[in-house]
From Swiss-Prot:
The gene is rplR. InterPro entries: Ribosomal_uL18_bac-type (IPR004389), Ribosomal_uL18_bac/euk (IPR005484). One of its GO terms (cellular component) is cytosolic large ribosomal subunit. This is Large ribosomal subunit protein uL18. Residues 1-10 have a biased composition (Basic and acidic residues). The keyword Endoplasmic reticulum does not apply. Keywords: Ribonucleoprotein, Ribosomal protein, RNA-binding, rRNA-binding. Transmembrane segments: none annotated. This is one of the proteins that bind and probably mediate the attachment of the 5S RNA into the large ribosomal subunit, where it forms part of the central protuberance. Belongs to the universal ribosomal protein uL18 family.
Amino acid sequence: MKTTRRDATRSRHQRVRRKVVGTAERPRLAVFRSNQHIYAQVIDDAQQHTLAAASTVESDLKSSSGATCDASTAVGKLVAERAIEKGIKAVVFDRGGNLYHGRVKALADAAREAGLEF
């Protein structure tokens, strides 16, 4: 049976997750990318708790096109602002099995510019 793109992304994500673990001091910035939207969460894996989140599904970001680099930039800025409000300055980046390119890279760059360190 042929391996689909989704299956390849899942196996890459499992490989990445073996190496990337978020703690209370340095939580994990997890990115999920679908065809129409992009989601970002700051997660403390020890407590299994989401500390901050943002996505293009939210009403304040819904006006921007969900599947573009501009929308990803807006999500990156918003999740970084929400994390900094909660006192989080450093994170570990989890690209979620996606290549570090395009929308995922735009989100990461925007989060760095907004003040998150990774």
